[in-house]
């Protein structure tokens, strides 16, 4: 169920032009600074804002416009004809209804079976809220209800426009978990400029600048590209895919297996062995040495190989490393890079000072 876009649109002086294809599963994050065109693109996909060009989802044509002034063969499906569920920064709920009333209204319009309504209520954990009016809900509760409503009617695509931007940190994690769960059964196009949300959710990423998708690909690949937009950021971060290993009770350390290596994290004893996880490693938290140190307090020191190097500022060098078949970044001084005589193919050791689950 891929989404193929070849569209353009204008709002005032702002021009958007996008040619891209959404993968048929998982979460694709539209990432970029405010004003890059992320929300505008999402609204065009939904049919809320006009655009020219072609939008095709799976075998269904949602939008097609030609150059002819007569436009006899144009296709432009209305919002309600597109099999989508939507969430926005502010939940668009009916404030004169209870939570149950909001769900019932959408279920009737989308002809959702009773069993599906019950399933969505259970999935989003909103059963205790059903009798409450939505104007008495907290921000986190309102967004959980909005997500439940978006899931009704079995949408084939979820469009989420910065759904967590108005929430405090205490409410975000639960909703991130719910969105990740929903993405197991329906593809998601997710707008954000928040790096934590990108790291937590993205399978694929579209990087937007000035109304264009300037790069797209698997999130791990785009994060670790030396010439990529994300690697140039001060908070440049890489992702490693691993799985939960053993827990050392006397040291309160949790092992995470990455290939044939193990990284150690404090605590986390409640994780399930074998469970797939993601690790985030900031480039500034990786230092390099040519031989294995024997007297370091750093727990995670792993063999790696230099893939490439790039100057990223006065006296700063970004090093791309291959570690257990995946790539991470190290930000070191240019002087250190020269003293170590680093070049592609150099075998060395990466000292990872901090690593965290996402």
From Swiss-Prot:
Keywords from the named record: ATP-binding, Cell inner membrane, Cell membrane, Membrane, Molybdenum, Nucleotide-binding, Translocase, Transport
Function, in words? Part of the ABC transporter complex ModABC involved in molybdenum import. Responsible for energy coupling to the transport system.
Residues the entry annotates as binding ATP: 32-39
Q: Which residues cross the membrane?
A: none
Q: Which Pfam families match?
A: ABC_tran, TOBE
GO cellular component, as recorded = plasma membrane
Q: What is its main location?
A: membrane
UniProt lists the family membership as follows:
Belongs to the ABC transporter superfamily. Molybdate importer (TC 3.A.1.8) family.
Name of the coding gene:
modC
PANTHER family recorded for this chain?
ABC TRANSPORTER I FAMILY MEMBER 10
Protein name stated in the entry: Molybdenum import ATP-binding protein ModC
The domain of life is Bacteria
Q: Which GO terms describe its molecular function?
A: ABC-type molybdate transporter activity; ATP binding; ATP hydrolysis activity
SMART domains, alphabetized? AAA
Signal sequence span per UniProt? none
Q: Which reaction does it catalyse?
A: molybdate(out) + ATP + H2O = molybdate(in) + ADP + phosphate + H(+)
EC number, UniProt record: 7.3.2.5
Compartment(s): Cell inner membrane
Q: What class of enzyme is it?
A: translocase
Database matches in PROSITE patterns: ABC_TRANSPORTER_1 (PS00211), ABC_TRANSPORTER_2 (PS50893), MODC (PS51241), MOP (PS51866)
The ABC transporter domain sits at 2-235
Sorted alphabetically, which NCBIfam families does this protein's record hold?
modC_ABC
The residue ranges of the Mop domain are 295-358
Assembly mode? The complex is composed of two ATP-binding proteins (ModC), two transmembrane proteins (ModB) and a solute-binding protein (ModA).
Task: Report the membrane topology from the UniProt record.
Answer: Peripheral membrane protein
């Amino acid at each position: 169920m891929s989404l193929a876009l070849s569209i353009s649109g204008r709002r005032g002086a702002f021009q958007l032009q996008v040619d891209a294809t959404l993968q048929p599963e998982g979460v694709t994050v539209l990432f970029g600074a405010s004003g890059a065109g992320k929300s505008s693109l999402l609204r065009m996909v939904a049919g809320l804002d006009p655009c020219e060009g072609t939008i095709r989802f799976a075998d269904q044509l949602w939008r097609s416009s030609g150059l002819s002034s007569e436009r006899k063969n144009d296709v432009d499906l209305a919002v309600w004809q597109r099999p989508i569920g939507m969430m926005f920064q502010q939940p668009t709920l009916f404030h004169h209804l209870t939570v149950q009333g909001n769900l019932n209204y959408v279920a009737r319009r989308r002809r959702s079976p009773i069993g599906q309504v019950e399933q969505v209520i259970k999935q989003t954990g909103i059963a205790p809220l059903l009798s409450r009016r939505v104007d008495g809900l907290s921000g986190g509760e309102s967004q959980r209800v909005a997500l439940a409503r978006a899931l009704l009617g079995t949408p084939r695509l979820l469009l989420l426009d910065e759904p967590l931007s108005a929430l405090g940190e205490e409410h975000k994690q639960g909703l991130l978990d719910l969105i990740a769960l929903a993405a197991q059964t329906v593809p998601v196009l997710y707008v954000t400029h928040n790096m934590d949300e990108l790291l937590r959710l993205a399978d694929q990423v579209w990087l937007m600048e000035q109304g264009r998708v300037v790069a797209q690909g698997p999130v791990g690949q785009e994060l670790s590209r030396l010439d990529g937009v994300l690697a140039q950021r001060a908070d440049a971060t890489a992702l490693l895919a691993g799985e939960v290993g053993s827990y050392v009770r006397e040291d309160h350390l949790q092992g995470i297996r990455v290939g044939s290596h193990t990284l150690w994290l404090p605590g986390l004893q409640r994780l399930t062995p074998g469970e797939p996880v993601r690790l985030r490693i900031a480039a500034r938290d990786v230092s390099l040495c040519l031989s294995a140190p024997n007297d370091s307090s750093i727990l995670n020191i792993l063999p790696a190989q230099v893939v490439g190097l790039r100057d990223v500022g006065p006296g700063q060098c970004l090093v791309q490393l291959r570690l257990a078949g995946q790539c991470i970044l190290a930000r070191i001084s240019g002087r250190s890079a020269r003293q170590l005589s680093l070049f592609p193919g150099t075998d060395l050791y990466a000292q990872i000072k901090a690593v965290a689950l996402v």
